Amino acid sequence: MNMKMRNQAAKRGGLLLCLSLCVLATGCREGALSYEYVDASQVPTPGQTSPDDGGKENSQTPDDPREDPPIVIPDGPMAGRSPMRLLTRYEYDNTTSALFGFTISAASEFPSENLADGFENNAWTHNVNMTLLRSYINASESISARAWEDPPAALSGCVGNASSSALCLEGIEDFTSIAFRRPAYEDEVALYQKLYRDMRSSEGARVAFETTVQAILQSPQFLYRLELFEPSPMKLPPRDGGMDAERFELVGPYEMASRLSYFIWGTMPDEELLAAAERGDLNTPEVLSEQVARMIADPRAREMTRQFHRQWLGLDAFGSVVKDETAFPMWKDGMSQDLRLSIEAFIEHVYWEEGAFDAFMTSPAVFLTPELAPLYGKAINEESGGLWREDFPAEERAGILTQPGMMALLAYPNQGSPIFRAIWVRERLLCQHLPPPPSDIQIEPPDPDPNATTREVFAIHTANEECAECHLLIDPLGFGFEGYDALGRWRDTENGKAIDTSGELIGSPEQAMNGPFDGVVDLANRLADSEAIAKCISRQWFTFAMGRPNDTSDADSMSRIYEQFLQDETAFPSLFEAIVLSDSFRYRKRPEVAQAEFEEANPDLVAMENAAEEQGGE
Amino acid sequence: MIKNRFGRRHFLRGMGGVAFALPLLSTGIISRDARAETTAEGVTFPKRFVFMIHPNGVIPQAWFPTRGPSGEDSDFQLGESHAPLEPLKDKLLLLENVNLEVGNWDRAVGPGEPHQKGMGGILTGRTLNDGQFVGGDGSRAGWGSGQSIDHYLAERVAKDTPLPTLHVGVRADSHIGSEVRSRVSYTASNQPAPPLNDPVDVFNLMFTDAMTDPGAMDEIKRRRGSVLDTVGSQFDSVYKRAGYEDRLTLERHLKMVRDLESRLAVDGGTIGGDCEKPATPPSLEVDSEDTMPQIATEHLDLVALALACDMTRFVTLQFSNSKNGLRYPWVDSFGDGHGLSHAGPSNETAAKELRARDRWHAQQAAYLLKKLDEIPEGDGTLLDNTVFVWCSEIAVGNTHSHRNLPILMAGSAGGYFKTGRFVSYGSERSTNDLLVNILNAFGQDVETYGDAQYCNGPLSGLT
């Protein structure tokens, strides 16, 4: 196959992928877009459409929009669920590094987390499996062997000339508390001390040391952020509006230390947080605000922000980005990595230098490497010694939507994708979701004309009545991105024809945002001013912070977070602080309330559990 | 300490009267008969189940065999895509008109789009949960809603292998990461079992212990036993202080710890006897089109070895993930896979690329099956004691249909399946029924699996 044929074949493949949407995604209405941001300002909405089950047996056919029951927004302050959370690979490596003072990166061999909403830290989907459990054994063995050579301070009495069994047993008590991020219970300490003594007498000091460390590293209290129900020592008056003390309680101080440190740093609490927890005053708004300010100034907060965006924006997909050598002879292996670095530098810039969401949406800054510069028509900056900032013309670039890296990611090897780009905007930036497809359409797509512009090819969608309904929610939005090719380069023509960047946004959660626009810069400026997108980004951060999406219990917290974010001109530090100060972050349901609600929501599971118990199961 | 490649024979288990020396094979794998058991019926070997999946359907004209003039099931010519499997034809079993009823798009069962349904439904026999994953069409679905048969079987018939299952992937997490379109195996509803994409990780997981000196390994196992005992005891401490929902999570965790504990205590899992030391795989970029063929080979070598060493009896092998847009440049396929699969029938260039991909997948299957067939076990081979199933998560790309899913089986599961045949069903049947056949082959007396409304009893004519 010659190169030209390759290119054409690739192009056909790409175009046809888009057509799959046409096959699948009809039956749309504007109102069928679901919007996942829920806050207290929303009045309960009845199902947007009445279920049309048309006599079908299965109530879950895609013809049936399977509308959620009407949303009932509870009144007043509340807090949502607080399930235990398994450390992610990132958190595991950070935690073991902080605990031992050396880095082994054992988690690089763990299987990947199960994603939810793009996030790795979802409490319900990131869970253990046998492979992971087996990997924990290997990891704990590697770490404990290294720790024997280079013990953490708490365990220094276990190793070396001055070591003794008595010193080590004392050290185990301290170490257990640090590793567990809370004071260890006596019964726990006794277990580890017993293991140490038994192993020491049978196999000597080293084996005793290593096995004890392994047992601690494999304990659920280490592997999970497990919030136990201890009465909080704090007797704070609930804030104005009144938290129902019968139903909610403040998160305990050590647990709050972990909530803070894993949210803002992705690692275990440092000494200062643990000291504040010990004093017992960590969960006051004043102390929390101080701690957030301190923590945000730390480099670990930057790294956490990188992690958030890696997941939210799907940046791991850069690993799979390839471009067609025929269409783009200047493309080189390794450029996808540079584009990833470029996006990360942009995020770092808008978060920590510009500091506000507005810049995220509108900044014309693009960060280049020597490899990338010629690709985007810039001279190499010899003095930069790495990535450097170039401000592109404001009519070409505005914020994340026009970043070359994002455009290249949301594209095929040989051409851009209006579909990928539009769905990405809907899902990730507007928190909107397209409705399920119809069940009864089968269309064999025609062979597209390889000389057509992307826009011309996609016109098929809207020319076909069945396709048009849904694609009106997608294509006109995506067409606005036609000014960027598959590498994210600005372009005026495609296949010798002038580029048309006119687009239209319909069905967005905010009426004022809807309407025609010309090019992404126009769109980006409109989105930057919108409430819907600021709400969506605060929801994404909330989801990341809590390890779960918001539910109706969080409605009041969501409103307050968003209001604070807006009041402080969408400054990111304000957003982090507002999340930490929210009721959802500071409070949790009392155990009996949580249990009653869980049982009500999961009757089948409860019946199963009860049956197992009656059978004398484990 | 790593044992020499041609090291001493170390029988791992009491062999009764069945210990017999086996010749070294040129493949570098030596069969392990340590798991053979003498029963009233004579010497029996463990049965294995290996499941292989590739995304985006097939070209049916090239996949399905042509029936011969006699009309007999055994009278058929392999399809063009399966040419690499020709030497193993007598050990193949191809099926026609078996539908993925839990996903069947025509009837649109449950949440999700066809790719999602196919991945989450094929081994679980269930529709998907509701959830947050965005499919190719913007619709949403959650994870699979039940246990897959590999885990079902591992819990029941293979309690003493070092690992219950092995899941390997060749770029299984590429682009979309870990979501319903990249997972086929489930320990339970909403509990997908992730594949390992890096052969080095597979090697470390499966063979670190096996490469340790058996004497030293006994000590390590004893220590691990003590550690896990302590871990288990500490559970009690947190359990009594945990909230209700967390207790359920802790119970699941503890159950797995106990399972792992008993597997680790099993005498075995060390190199010796008929299980050879694998070479350490090279460190390769795992998410790259440049390394895919090599990674596939490394994985297949490790899978063969894991089975030969009886490290596990249940394997899933995944080529990328469903609806992926990967290129296969090494077979001159430069289009993106999912896009190509949508091409209309008149698009010959796309069809040619897809045929080349199907054939490459067949080569991978042939490579593995040939290896398994070179490992003697009793009168037959390891392949004879295996049931291998290869399919895709949809039947055909441009319709996304789940009708007539392409299914190729190999190995007879110890003589249970009658191979060397192409079996076609007049009335359409369900993949759930095939799951029942497989369970029956492992001695599981079940009549349905997964959601019973999609079951009609085991497929006829296979045994």
Where are these regions (language model features)?
Chain A
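A cross-family structural signal marking well-folded subdomains
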Residues: 286-424, 435, 614-617
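N-terminal secretory signal peptides that target proteins for export/translocation
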Residues: 1-11, 44
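A conserved hydrophobic secondary-structure block that centers on an alpha-helix together
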Residues: 163-212, 220-223
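Sequence context surrounding c-type heme c attachment/ligation sites in exported
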Residues: 179, 373, 389-528, 532-534, ...
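Ser/Thr-rich, Pro/Gly/Ala-heavy low-complexity intrinsically disordered linkers and tails
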Residues: 28-75, 240, 610-617
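Long, ordered, helix-rich scaffold segments
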Residues: 146-148, 152, 205, 223-227, ...
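C-terminal motif of bacterial Sec signal peptides marking the signal peptidase cleavage site
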Residues: 23-27
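Short, functional "switch" segments adjacent to catalytic/cofactor/reactive centers
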Residues: 67, 113, 122-173, 226, ...
